[in-house]
């Protein structure tokens, strides 16, 4: 029977023994020279340029990053499930740990926000109850909270927003706002029931006739302030957009509730007050305090109206103070958070061996592990995020214990202790940094500047410019941990090839360089199979034969006559220095300057100082650009004034369209700067910075202050239109609106207290938003509501004078 049989042979080698048996030469006497006779064959790692470990032991570090659009919490959960399943098949002695998980900070931060949300809700309920002094009345505005929040969740789903830090912070602010409209409705209904002895149904009907327009106007204005900021571009626009949509939707839904459900509940739940029923002492005290406050408030307005010049001068001082605070309050992009870890970079002199770097790294790890606040220390020796692979660098990631386990020790205190210890190491420089506030924007927190060699600037010019900038910046106390990525003087051995000799010897030039590379570095020659995978085969000289300059004399190439020629006869060697690598940014050779601001300085201040040094000390062909978070901060830095101006413009245009008049919008807007001054004064008092979160709170504050002003101005306008005296109308409106404005403002202010005193993960963000709004609303409710009636009177008088002048001119 005829059959077909395939012929097979040995393919790729797969064992050390097979490689050792490779025949290199057959001698005339019949002997063979095999690979094992001239070389050591072993399974080794593909690279020895870096080492990694954890808590002083060896470890393979695996970083897992999520793709854009993925949910961090879901990814982390699935990774943990997968690792748990894979670990069942690990060989004995091999185990895994997850020392670093950024989602731990995210989940803890969200937990703290939930806690703040609950605290704010409790405080708002208490304020509402003490203000309305009846559980029946309290239920009506409180019902607006879950309805508004649940409805907001639905719209967040439609817009594709997740439940993250920004949206949750927006919901915290919303809690103090969504009850406002319902409180105004309930207070007005109860006042009419008491004063006019009407039934709940009739009182509700009459109250809504006078309130509907004001409620719609106030809520629309509060939503309108977020319209311009929603269209900002970049990272800042994303931050504003999620926050603004959350607030705007919750406010609009609360207004819908106040116009529909709240009146129905008022007519069904509220009951007339029994005059014979004994008064609660607490409520009696509160009512007495409110009555005295109302009387003094109206009296204060009378005095203010009688001295317009003093008020206008004072208002001018307010405007000047705002500009002063705007220049004096330090700026930054986002507040620095305690994310539960920080990095330490050790920089030894260039040319240091990996073994020496490992020794210093082990000492640093041993010290860090003694700190009771430290849980893990992960090290990558021979690498740095600032310069890449370098045997003279080592990066340590210090993962701290959970926030509750650290007592009162802050990450700043821990980093200072580490800095004080490691700076005593004479053999290295130490750089400490926190992670970027927004993962992915830069490799670390702090600032990141790019010095660029433009035009005719050479690499040497860039080196000199970098040294100049580093020198002058290091003289300033505002900087901490200043460093550069420039590696300009790495020790090198230069081999000067005598090309004439090479040609005369008949040696191909490529053989000279390939031989040197094979001995001193490594050369990839083939592949081998193992564990059903393909691995590479490299050749390299043993360590003793590549340690010294003289070893080059042991490297031979074959000449055209068959003789072996040492490389030292084909060239000379000389020690020199040069760059290890040259980085480029926007097509220019660049030097990256990184660092952090000292405790008493902000990132905005140090960025201005660096720009000033660059202008004054560097040549014109050296350019400056910002990257990472610094670029975003620079882009957002000039937006504060423009954002406030746009918000004021939108409020003016909206009110002008709503009331078909320019007088009411001006009367409302001109009373708002005092609230802005209060916000700036608050952050300055608390040592905070003018960052994006503060600006978000500022936009919110303008809307809230405008809302209070509209409640007074809108009612005063109706009184004037009905023929009442201008001043009397303003006083009457202020008298009637004092209690609801005070109640709603107190509810919001106390709702901000948990944010102002926030601690734990994510506390810096909560403080940044809450502090400015908290102090701004206090000033708005104490000083601002005095100015609203005053400016209403002044604007209307000016309006009437213009009308009279026009009539005289016509006649």
Regions found by a protein language model. Name each.
Residues 26, 161, 229-239, 312-352, ...:
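Transmembrane helices with small-residue packing motifs
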Residues 37-40, 51-126, 210, 228, ...:
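Juxtamembrane "pre-transmembrane" interface segments
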Residues 95, 122-131, 135-191, 231, ...:
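Hydrophobic transmembrane alpha-helices and their membrane-interface caps
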Residues 99, 106, 110, 186, ...:
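Helix-loop junctions and hydrophobic alpha-helical segments within the transmembrane domains
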Residues 211, 281-335, 735:
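Signature of alpha-helical transmembrane segments and their immediate interfacial
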Residues 260-265, 760-811:
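Hydrophobic alpha-helical transmembrane segments of membrane transport and translocation systems
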């Amino acid at each position: 029977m005829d059959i077909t049989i395939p012929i097979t042979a040995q393919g790729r080698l797969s064992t050390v023994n097979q490689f050792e048996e490779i025949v290199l030469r057959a001698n005339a006497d019949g002997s063979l020279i095999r690979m094992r006779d001239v070389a050591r064959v072993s399974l080794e790692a593909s690279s020895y340029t870096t080492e990694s470990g954890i808590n002083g032991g060896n470890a393979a570090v695996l970083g897992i990053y999520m793709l854009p659009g993925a949910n961090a919490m879901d990814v982390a959960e699935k990774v943990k499930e997968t690792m748990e399943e894979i670990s069942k098949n690990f060989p004995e002695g091999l185990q895994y740990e997850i020392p670093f998980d950024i989602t731990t900070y995210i989940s803890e931060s969200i937990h703290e926000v939930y806690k703040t949300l609950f605290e704010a809700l409790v405080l708002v309920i208490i304020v509402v109850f003490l203000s309305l002094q009846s559980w029946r009345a309290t239920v009506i505005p409180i019902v607006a909270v879950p309805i508004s929040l649940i409805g907001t969740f639905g719209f967040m789903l439609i817009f594709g927003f997740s439940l993250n830090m920004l949206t949750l912070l927006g919901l915290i602010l919303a809690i103090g706002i969504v009850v406002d409209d319902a409180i105004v409705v309930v207070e007005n209904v109860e006042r009419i029931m008491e004063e006019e002895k009407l039934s709940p149904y009739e009182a509700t009907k009459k109250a809504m006739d006078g309130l509907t327009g004001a409620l719609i106007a106030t809520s629309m204005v509060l939503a309108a302030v977020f319209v311009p900021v929603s269209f900002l571009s970049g990272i800042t626009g994303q931050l504003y957009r999620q926050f603004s949509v959350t607030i705007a939707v919750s406010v609009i839904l609360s207004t819908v509730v106040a116009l529909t459900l709240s009146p129905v509940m008022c007519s069904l739940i509220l009951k007339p007050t029994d005059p014979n029923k004994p008064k609660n002492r607490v409520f009696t005290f509160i009512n007495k305090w409110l009555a005295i406050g109302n009387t003094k408030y109206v009296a204060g307005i009378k005095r203010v109206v009688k001295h317009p010049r003093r008020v206008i001068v004072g208002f001018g001082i307010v405007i000047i103070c705002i500009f002063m605070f705007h220049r004096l309050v330090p700026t930054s992009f986002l507040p620095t958070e305690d994310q539960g870890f920080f990095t330490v970079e050790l920089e030894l002199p260039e040319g240091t061996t990996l073994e020496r770097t490992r020794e210093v790294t082990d000492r640093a790890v041993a010290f860090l592990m003694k700190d009771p606040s430290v849980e893990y220390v992960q090290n990558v020796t021979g690498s740095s995020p600032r310069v890449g692979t370098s045997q003279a660098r080592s990066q340590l990631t210090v993962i701290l214990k959970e926030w509750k386990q650290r007592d009162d020790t802050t990450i700043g205190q821990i980093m200072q202790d580490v800095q004080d210890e490691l700076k005593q190491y004479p053999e290295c420089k130490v750089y400490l940094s926190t992670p970027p506030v927004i993962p992915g924007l830069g490799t670390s927190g702090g600032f990141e500047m790019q010095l660029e060699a433009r035009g005719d600037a050479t690499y040497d010019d860039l080196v000199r410019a970098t040294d100049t900038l580093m020198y002058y910046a290091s003289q300033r106390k505002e900087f901490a941990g200043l460093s550069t990525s420039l590696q300009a003087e790495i020790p090198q051995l230069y081999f000067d090839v005598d090309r004439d000799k090479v040609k005369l010897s008949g040696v191909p030039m490529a053989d000279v360089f390939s031989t040197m590379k094979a001995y001193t570095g490594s050369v990839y020659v083939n592949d081998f199979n193992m564990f059903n995978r393909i691995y590479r085969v490299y050749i390299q000289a043993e360590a003793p034969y590549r340690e010294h300059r003289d070893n080059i004399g042991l490297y031979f190439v074959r000449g055209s006559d068959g003789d072996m020629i040492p490389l030292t006869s084909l060239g000379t060697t000389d020690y020199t220095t040069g760059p290890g690598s040259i980085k480029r940014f926007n097509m220019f050779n660049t030097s990256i300057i990184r660092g952090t601001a000292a405790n008493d300085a902000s990132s905005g201040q140090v960025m201005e100082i660096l720009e000033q040094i660059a202008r004054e000390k560097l040549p014109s062909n050296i350019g400056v650009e910002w990257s990472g978070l610094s670029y975003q901060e620079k882009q957002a830095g000039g937006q504060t004034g423009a954002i406030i101006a746009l918000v004021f413009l939108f409020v003016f245009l909206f009110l002008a369209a709503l009331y078909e008049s320019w007088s009411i919008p001006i009367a409302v807007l001109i009373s708002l700067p005092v609230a802005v001054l209060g916000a700036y004064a608050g952050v300055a008092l608390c040592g905070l910075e003018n960052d994006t979160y503060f600006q978000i709170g500022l936009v919110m504050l303008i809307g809230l202050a405008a809302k209070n002003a509209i409640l007074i101005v809108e009612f005063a306008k109706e009184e004037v239109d009905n023929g009442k005296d201008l001043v009397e109308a303003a006083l009457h409106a202020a008298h009637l609106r004092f209690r609801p404005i005070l109640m709603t403002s107190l509810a919001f202010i106390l709702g901000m207290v948990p944010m102002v005193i926030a601690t734990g993960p994510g506390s810096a963000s909560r403080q940044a938003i809450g502090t400015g709004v908290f102090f701004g609303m206090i000033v708005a409710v104490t000083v601002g509501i005095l100015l609203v009636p005053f400016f209403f009177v002044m604007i209307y008088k000016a309006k009437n004078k213009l009308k009279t002048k026009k009539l005289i001119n016509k006649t």
